[in-house]
């Protein structure tokens, strides 16, 4: 197997045993990117000079047996809405084209401290608004499993790069499914941690009460290793939780005999494709064969997840994106002749169609005549959705269901139909609204396109999610498929 398809865990062993140098790993990764990414189009910017320099420094530490760090010498790709000091961060928008931050996000500080090596920044939907990575101002990423298909979104570049063997792990952000849905479409493992588990300091805000950073990998244990490295409270993020337990790997191999798993009837209902239902039902039988107890339950407010999510997320986005005014940073229109024109033209020209749609939607929902009818009501629905989950978790350890209602759709198929695009978030948005952890793992393929299985857990119980996902992965995975793509 080429180094490019090795797992994080195996690469760490090879480096620690001095069978390979960090600089050799980094060289192999850049060779893979040069060969494959002109087709996949997952990267927006590469940090090659700094990566090679860092890898050579790690070579010297390796020679001295000073290999500190949980991710010593491991290459990584980072979604382009996560601030990287000295490296362009654009959110895939014309508005931030050429913007180079002068500070580091907390997750990047943590990863640098663990001696991971930054390879580059990954494509995404503009400002994380979209489900296909087609709203990017710069390029359209394709699905490594089928180049006619979308990789999902908004973390499409993060999922595609991992599936294509261009990095062993990446970071994405998940506001309504933006890690889990592309993970499902691209056949990789994607974790959306509990809200507050990972610091959001340095994540360009979309919807602050929903956003969460998480890892994408080709296997479950790698995912747990990366989440251990980036978790923890942060004084710079008042919403980060002071939870000390960040051990996700010690019990990962423990069996799931007697584990109580809930299967909501709504998750296999209207709107979910037959091939997805079949794959999930097969996965449920696999869980039973592993000793889990799977029972049907109801999450009655699931159907209200999409409307309440889009009102809340768009409302928060309209506020968060007001900072892009053409004055302090970002795109600045040269044609404006007054302050009002500068605001109007900079924002009209700098933002794409989908971002403007959500700003309008959010501004409308927050306006004085409609606040109670839309925003306030959506927050009440959010509470009902959370209560549904709380009730189920009184008797069950984990909830299971599809990650997305279909496999990846074709490029260009849904980009001009926002309601159809939004409907793809049916099974992921409730998890964000409730602030819960959710992980997507591959559970099948249909016409060559992967199908994702989602496990949802109690707050801060990522450990159980990793345990059940790891056991399921022993029975079904795509580990032998990636290299053939």
Curated annotation (Swiss-Prot):
The active site is at residues 79, 154, 178. It is an enzyme of class 6 (ligase). One of its GO terms (biological process) is translation. One of its GO terms (molecular function) is glutaminyl-tRNA synthase (glutamine-hydrolyzing) activity. Keywords: ATP-binding, Ligase, Nucleotide-binding, Protein biosynthesis. GO terms for cellular component: glutamyl-tRNA(Gln) amidotransferase complex. The keyword Translocase does not apply. It holds the Pfam family Amidase. Its EC number is 6.3.5.7. It catalyses: L-glutamyl-tRNA(Gln) + L-glutamine + ATP + H2O = L-glutaminyl-tRNA(Gln) + L-glutamate + ADP + phosphate + H(+). Allows the formation of correctly charged Gln-tRNA(Gln) through the transamidation of misacylated Glu-tRNA(Gln) in organisms which lack glutaminyl-tRNA synthetase. The reaction takes place in the presence of glutamine and ATP through an activated gamma-phospho-Glu-tRNA(Gln). PANTHER family: GLUTAMYL-TRNA(GLN) AMIDOTRANSFERASE SUBUNIT A, TRANSAMIDASE. Belongs to the amidase family. GatA subfamily. HAMAP family: GatA. NCBIfam families: gatA. Heterotrimer of A, B and C subunits. This is Glutamyl-tRNA(Gln) amidotransferase subunit A. The gene is gatA.
